[in-house]
């Protein structure tokens, strides 16, 4: 089977070894199968993404020896498609406005999830407000995020028991979606529209991605994405959640922790051949 895989970084900082490992894993799977490898820039959050980081990550990938099929897809150029999906979900009655502040969200989340941004946390926020309360907050110009109501989604789908995906990892098999672990997750914001979790399922479907290959830190997000795929009548790809690369301190590489970047390694004289060998891709 020819695989269609993708690497979808967010240009919010420079790439590190963890990114290189993930990109090489997806690229190798596609090339060994005679398939296609796609590069997608997940830059929906214009408040944090920077063009210089996109330029740098493309340079890093080329330095690693990676190539991709077709043009680079930038999510910032596809907001119409994502907002259409957001509108469909609103029309279904499965979204509600959440007016909690960033500080409140961070306190509830207890840490930073994907995107290093507490506004994406799935902690329970009390559900939708009454019409009177919501109208008052909107009249005051209070900022809000759109959250997916799991109760409403469950009612519309007749339950989550039938939602599953095929996992091809060290623990392969059919996995049942358990979206309750993340609660009512943020799927959009007033300032940027539809967020990562919607944009990714829309793009995976439109680009014909057969295998989503990414870090195991995102395995819980798959349950929410299965709910969205079911609501939006989108196909379900096969998933491979690979191990996370850990640094000398035993912690996973992360932008927010100042992990050594690929640019810094390159400037220090490390070659792409050496790094690929270190990561297991000799």
Write out the residue ranges for each language-model feature.
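Active-site cores that bind ATP or allylic diphosphates and position pyrophosphate for catalysis
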Residues: 104-253, 261-266
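N-terminal Rossmann-like or analogous alpha/beta NTP/dinucleotide-binding catalytic cores
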Residues: 1-114, 205, 213-217, 221-234
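Short, surface-exposed acidic
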Residues: 69-71, 236-239, 273-275
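Non-catalytic terminal extensions that flank enzyme cores
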Residues: 1-14, 32, 37, 133-139, ...
């Amino acid at each position: 089977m020819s695989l269609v895989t993708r690497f979808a970084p967010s240009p919010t900082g420079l790439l590190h070894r963890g990114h290189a490992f993930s990109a090489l894993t997806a690229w190798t799977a596609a090339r060994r199968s005679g398939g296609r490898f796609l590069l997608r820039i997940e830059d929906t959050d214009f408040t944090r993404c920077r063009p210089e980081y996109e330029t740098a990550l493309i340079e890093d990938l080329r330095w690693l020896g990676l190539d991709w099929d077709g043009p680079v897809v930038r999510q910032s150029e596809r907001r119409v498609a994502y907002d259409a999906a957001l509108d469909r979900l609103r029309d279904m009655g499965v979204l509600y406005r959440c007016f909690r502040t960033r500080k409140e969200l961070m306190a509830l989340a207890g840490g930073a999830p994907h995107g290093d941004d507490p506004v994406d946390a799935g902690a329970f926020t009390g559900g939708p407000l009454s019409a009177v309360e919501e109208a008052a907050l909107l009249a005051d110009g209070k900022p809000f995020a759109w959250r997916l109501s799991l109760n409403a989604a469950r009612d519309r789908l007749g339950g989550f028991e039938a939602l599953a995906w095929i996992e091809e990892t060290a623990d392969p098999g059919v996995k049942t979606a358990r979206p309750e672990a993340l609660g009512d997750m943020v799927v959009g914001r007033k300032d940027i529209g539809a967020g990562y979790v919607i944009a990714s399922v829309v793009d995976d479907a439109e680009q014909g991605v057969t295998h989503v290959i990414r870090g195991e830190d995102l395995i819980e997000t798959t349950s929410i994405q299965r709910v969205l795929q079911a609501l939006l009548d989108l196909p379900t790809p096969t998933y491979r959640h690979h191990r996370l690369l850990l640094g000398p301190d035993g912690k996973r590489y992360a932008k927010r922790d100042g992990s050594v970047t690929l640019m810094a390694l390159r400037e220090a004289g490390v070659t792409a051949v050496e790094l690929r060998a270190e990561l297991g891709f000799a």
